[in-house]
Amino acid sequence: SMHMGYEPGTYLPEADAILVIDCDVPWIPSLHKLNPDAKVIQLGADPLFENYPVRGFPCDLGIRGSAGSAIPMLEEAMAIRAKSAGARIDARRAKIAGIKGDQAAANQGRIDKIASGTAAMDNAWVAHCLNQVKQDDDVLVSESQLALGNIALREPGSFFGTSPSGGLGWGLGAAHGVKLGQRAKRVFCVVGDGAYMFGNPTPAHFVSAAYDLPVLTVIMNNKMWGSVRKATLGLYPEGAASSSNKAPLTYLDPAPEYHKIVEASDGYGEEVTDPADLPAALERGIKAVDVDERQAVINVHTTYDDAAAKADAVR
């Protein structure tokens, strides 16, 4: 695989060609700098997003068309040129393999620390454990900062995330919509604790029970508005909020026992505070959904310290 992860900033400065596919914000200009000689190709039904009042991304070549139709045509055209560029392609593939190996080693080191108890449970661990129990044709709906680099997504339609326009609380309803449309599929819904509250969990779980839509919801509960903390530290890394022990309008503490809300609608709820307990908890949630045909909520206590928030803010 040539997939390099979900953070483009590391590779943009040395890229000589950038193909943007149906993406209105492919990078953050204030954070990510392009190679000045790079050629930017934008592909999509509206490659320039002409209905946006302001959009300042460069475009050396705009290709208007459906990505599903255009990409196979582009692949066919590139295959002809590849015949004369074998050595360059092999060198590039070897370089990328090395980078991916370094990424995998760093990620595994992080997972090993959590597994050994020398690091606290975070989003990467949740993703790692989910990846151990999910099947390729399961559907994952995420309104969270889930570490997608730890999730193997191999099947089309197996992942749904929030749109660029946002919509706080989207995740719970979207997951039930996916289950309603694909009843034979197992559906995971991963949300932050703030997104869970925005999703109106009481009516969401009522609808799940009333319409027989057993979804397994995983709450990554860091007891805060993580996006607010990240954005604040990104804009004002040395500001008053960064030196505050508990910045206002950020923390959701004391945290409710979210896993008990689902029990009011005859669902299965469980709380996880120890990383070692998460795999078994997920299996119990899957049993509730698959065997008992009940919805389930796993309330996972995670950490998100200021160092992680600052690092995320500049990716």
Named regions from a protein language model:
Residues 8-12, 63-67, 71, 85-92, ...:
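Generic structural signal for well-ordered, non-membrane alpha-helical segments
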Residues 16-22, 48, 71-82, 100, ...:
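Structural signal for hydrophobic packing residues in well-ordered secondary-structure cores
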Residues 19-20, 42, 142, 189, ...:
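Redox-cofactor binding/interface segments in oxidoreductases and associated redox assembly factors
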Residues 2-3, 12-15, 55-56, 64, ...:
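Thiamine diphosphate
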Residues 1-96, 282-286:
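Glycine-rich, acidic loop regions that bind phosphate or pyrophosphate groups
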Residues 97-184:
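Active-site diphosphate/adenylate-binding microenvironment
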Residues 46, 142-148, 221-225:
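Short glycine-enriched loops at secondary-structure junctions
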Residues 23, 145, 302:
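Short glycine-/small-residue-rich Rossmann-like dinucleotide-binding loops
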